[in-house]
Amino acid sequence: MTIKAITFDLDDTLWPLKPTLIHAENETYEWLKINAAALTNQFSLADMSEFRFRLFKEDIRFKNQISQVRKETIKAFALRSDYSEREALELSEQAFSVHYQLRQKVNCYEGVEELLSNLSKNHLLGTISNGNADVKQTPIGHHFSFALSAEHINSSKPDSLIFDTALSNIESLLGQRLDPSEIVHVGDDFLCDIVGAKRAQFKAIWLDGHEHKHDCIKKHEFKKENTECRQSEGLSDGLSKKLSEEIVADAIINHIKDLPAALLSLSS
């Protein structure tokens, strides 16, 4: 079957997340030191990170809203530091703006730019991400015809809604109905990307090679739950394990540069 479109995860698939995120968080905290000393004199970056993670995990309002969680965290600590409601809100918006600009300063893996340039000649390309990076603000953004994020759809991988939305986008852009199996999704997280894509009847290629990626799920072995993905669809540990054991990627690659060969094998 001819592959008509390819969708990509972003973080830890096209670029490493950790260096960008650490830099953005550190620089945002430095900004707060200058602009909200009363806050940073009392609370550390670690304090804020722990609060943010707990808020994301426990408060259903922020289930798919990473950006809002960051704003709410800064606002909460500003209020604890005796800033007024108005001042706390302004600080949260300004600090998040600093963070968000830095969040887009990604360094793609070797070969990604050339890969996307070549693939875009014959395939429609899009992105499906649970993160809040705006791929259109990155150096590779021009290669993609659409970009979906969990917070804009209010649905996270592996939930079928975000994949169904991708299918609708692709059909609209191509002006034709597609079988979902004519779309390939590429990602590093087995539960979010591979389980999600296969349940939506997409083809799925698992990028299982970067040393920074979560070592949580092997092809038939569930080692550690992925909290973000499981939360997004209310998946229990047992169901997550069952899905990971039953679903197999259509291809597995160790580096993003190996993708063309994997795509060729799926087309033959």
Which residues fall in each region the model found?
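N-terminal helical cap/lid subdomain that shapes the substrate entry/recognition surface
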Residues: 2-110
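Asp-based, Mg2+/Mn2+-dependent phosphohydrolase catalytic module
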Residues: 1-6, 18, 34, 41, ...
